[in-house]
Amino acid sequence: RADQVLDRLVASGNLTEEEVAGARTHPAEVLARGKDEGREYFVDWIAQQVEEKLPDTTGRIVVYTTLDLRRQRAGEEAVEHALAGMGKERNVSQGSLIALAPDGAVLAMVGGRSYVESQFNRATQAKRQPGSAFKPIVYLAALEAGYTPESPVTDEPVSMGGWSPRNASSRDWGTVNLTTALANSINTISVQVGNRIGIDRIVSTAERLGIEGPLPRNLSIVLGSSEVTLIELASAYTPFGNEGRRTEPYGITSIEAENGDTLYRHVPASEQVIKRE
């Protein structure tokens, strides 16, 4: 990783190959884990964006970000606590977390348990099946198709093409409304609803919320069989708490040159993807 940084410094013209030769010959000693290690995932993510926004910039710059240190510390502690508890019980060694403000500002980002052990950012790079976390998107599609929160739906066995999804518990829910079905994550009802409104509507809704896919064209999508990144899924949730408006996640508020000139400033932008009513 140190060599990659040195290569970038040479490529950008900030240093010559002769100037970095000593650093290559005598690399820095790796220090023990520090208190700020968890923030390095966010720093890496920001560094990539700086290169994309200002590819030809040379010299020193000052980057102002959205990171909230209090929330970042809380996020790191939450991930570690979860991995030490339930994670240990289920043999899960890694986890990630991202906290977004309604306007898309990234307030906290935890890409893994230890940046020293793994620089792979699981919050922005790892694609995982969201499972039941995908269901709010399905139920949004149902509401847009004419269902209401009080629409009655019945918990009954489902079998489609040899696929028979089951609920997490053996409880027979009987007939409940749509709100109760979502609140209790009832698989059988979710699949029935998805079948009635159609896969195309679900896929279209997911894409409108920012899920990039590829999304499966079968009913397993209802139970979260598609693969998404954590930042992608979190971003898809923002319209629910933002009066239906979607914003792209961002981590840089502004970039200044050493002399104070503004080189970049984030301009808030949003798109109405859900009707406010």
Language-model segments: residues:
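Second-shell loop/turn segments in exported
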Residues: 5-6, 10, 29-37, 58-66, ...
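Acidic/histidine-enriched alpha-helical segments
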Residues: 11-30, 89-100, 154-159, 250-261
